[in-house]
């Protein structure tokens, strides 16, 4: 997303000079599931410079707090894997009281098309996150 200019469902919810945060591409199993990607091309977390590293945790915390306050999540996960896409990105994933066990914790990363939420629901969640992150 940072380099390709592809618009995923929900679009961009936050951006600055260092990072861009956007709704997880389809199939999105949980409304408010966000990817945070570095603007600068780096392979992994270990390649972030000092400024990027110092900015990442506060940004993730803001997103997780917005997932709780704006969407009603009762918890939020952070995953950094880097196996399939050779560009730094983090998964910031809300968990809701009614999130099924098969989508809790790391299992959410194995979601299938059958788990996809309606695009309208994903879009609405991203707009709510975007508004919360502007406050």
Segments (PLM) and residue ranges:
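HIT superfamily nucleotide-processing domains
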Residues: 1-135
